[in-house]
Design a protein with these regions (language model features):
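Acidic, two-metal ion nucleic-acid-processing modules in DNA metabolism proteins
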Residues: 1-196
């Protein structure tokens, strides 16, 4: 079985070589098949030979539903969006974006310090927390984008000049009887508005 990407119709590509299969079925984004061991290598060669994907086709595309300021991220909005569940391929979870966000602080957490608990801040000083699950990757990127000194300031919770753009999901956090809305970042990049 296999899963595909939007730019590659896996089922059609497999059907172009249907003589190699015992049986094959699926749709553009996924397929399943039964094949003999002897036909496996000819299939691999045919699919690789006929593949017309470009580097651009392999870049993940994220579709933002709305640009949403921190002050708009409220529990009532979260509860309204929760009515759209369950999320899946045909009903994707709403994705929001904010540009020119500051990073107030990062604290590495988890058994191996692999997650980054972040506090983000907008231009008005409004703050929101978020958990980045690829925390070490985020720290490495911050060092590349802004330098070691700015990264150290962020880790110490000091004033810094880092600006990022974030794509995120809203998440409800319940801790010690307190309910709050957090960001669940999906993608973070150096802000297009950052000036060195």
């Amino acid at each position: 079985s296999g899963r595909s990407i939007e730019t590659y119709n896996m089922f059609d590509k497999l059907c172009e070589h249907k003589e190699l299969f015992v049986k094959v079925g699926g749709h553009p984004m996924a397929a399943g098949f039964t094949i003999t061991r002897e036909a496996l290598e000819p299939l691999r060669e045919a699919l690789n030979r006929d593949c017309n994907l470009t580097d651009a086709d392999l870049v993940e595309k994220l579709y933002v539903d709305e640009s949403c300021a921190i002050k708009q991220l409220t529990l009532p909005l979260y509860e309204e969006l929760a009515k759209l569940e369950p999320y899946g391929t045909a009903n994707v979870r709403p994705l929001f974006g904010i540009v020119k966000m500051g990073i107030r602080s990062i604290k590495m957490v988890g058994n191996e310090g692999q997650y980054a608990r972040c506090t983000f801040v907008d231009g008005n000083g409004t703050r929101i927390n978020g958990m980045v699950f690829r925390g070490k990757e985020l720290l490495d990127n911050i060092k590349v984008w802004f330098g070691d000194k700015e990264c150290d300031k962020i880790l110490k919770g000091l004033q810094n000049h880092a600006l990022i753009d974030i794509l995120y999901h809203m998440k409800k956090n319940e801790f010690n009887g307190t309910v709050s809305i957090q960001m669940e970042p999906v993608s973070i990049r150096k802000s297009v508005y950052y000036e060195t």
